[in-house]
Amino acid sequence: MIVHVDLDAFFASVEVLLDPSLAGRPVIVGGTGARGVVAACTYEARAFGVHSAMPSARARRLCPQAVFLPGRYDRYAEYSTRFHEVLHAYTPKVEGIALDEAFLDVEGALRRGRSVAELGRALRRDVHAELGLDASVGAAATKFLAKLASEAAKPTADRAGTRPGAGVVVIEPGTELAFLHPLPVRSLWGVGPATHRRLERFGVRTVGELAAVPEASLVAALGPSLGHHLHELAWARDARTVAAEREIKSVSHEETYARDLRDPAELATEAVRLSDGVASRLRRAGLAGRTVTIKVRFGDFTTVTRSRTLGEAVDTAPVIARTATALLGAIDVTVGVRLLGVGVSKLTEGAAHQLSLLADGPDRAGRTDPRPGPAVGRPSGPGPSGPGPTPASGGRTAANSVSAPAPAAAWGAATEAVDRIRERFGDRAVGPAVLAGAGGLRVKRRGDSPWGPAAPVETAAAGDPGEASGRAKTAVESAERVVDTPGSCEDGDP
């Protein structure tokens, strides 16, 4: 039996825990600006039609009285760690798929004599006792049915008010199709808006109606991969098991900007900032990667990606940034860039083996860098490539980025020094010189308000009282979708 545990309205519920004055009020966490999106909201906000992934501007129109908060990723991560500790007390077979949800293989726990429903209720009690948060639990023989069951267990809300959910829903063996077939077809994994519209044109609105379509017809209409996938799910077939440790396939950062960027030099600087964040996360995870990918989304939402595979695995900002800026240089950005992303994939464990810093000319894989990266600094330290560290605001030190090639040994020593400084003094204590400004270093880190740029300070949370208002008016520089992808990149992320 597989169990799916999902914290209810996680980010918003944490905010209510941290500020009890928000209890009973519509609270929306996400990007507060025109290009922001809703990350989570309380059920009081859902009663007005607000939901996650909705544009923040629309959420504000639907529920103008809501408290809008930019979110505090670091605090959510703390609660997530405690949440997963509770789950591991039940079974070592825990597959975390987000900060607030996970799959559990509970076959071992069930052999101790309790039913899966009893185990689900105990899980909810322990999560609430440890975190003060509510969780919904679903159980079934397959992963996707367990997730559907947890969704069915959740509270619901409309203008009439919030109604508590069952808390625990178990789909017993033999009852799968009775549960599944009445559901709307959009409940299935893989049915996005475009596929949903296509299926509706064929008269398919429920999972049961989809199950009645021959697989060959689905393959002809949707393609072999999606057609077969949906046919299997419609008959409750899902062979995936709980993976206790999911392999990370890529590490990426991306950012949505409050205005479209058109200046190539400004975008090159942003590529350096994103590359520095990716490199730092790679090293902390003990990983290195061979393929560097950039993602560019223009103002009209057209999106392009470009990749280059290097001869060796890398984990340092200079080499990643140099590759990213070279890829960016081959794209016409003057039409305006809404979002920029940098990612590294084809990962390996252990130290990177960087024998060169992509000197001009063919790299070790035989590829030629089409243009040198922008001159954005030289390696820190007294070596031959630079005179030493560059002072940043507040007496901090800016290490450097990517202009001229440098010996691998020099970069390795510099990188180790940067990591030691950041471990002791924080991520913003040292970084690429090009990122230094009057306000200090603009480094990119995981959780830097991931849901869109902030609204202007005077409009971010008009009318929100107290501490909540102060947090909502906090300026948020950036938005990111950070993915440690357990498989192919999600939603186009590099």
Region spans (language model):
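Gly/Gly-Pro- and Ser/Thr-rich, intrinsically disordered tail segments characteristic of DNA damage-repair
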Residues: 1-229, 242, 280, 362-379, ...
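DNA-contacting surface of Y-family translesion DNA polymerases
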Residues: 187, 195-338, 349-352, 493-494
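Conserved alpha/beta core segments of nucleic-acid transaction machinery
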Residues: 352, 358-360
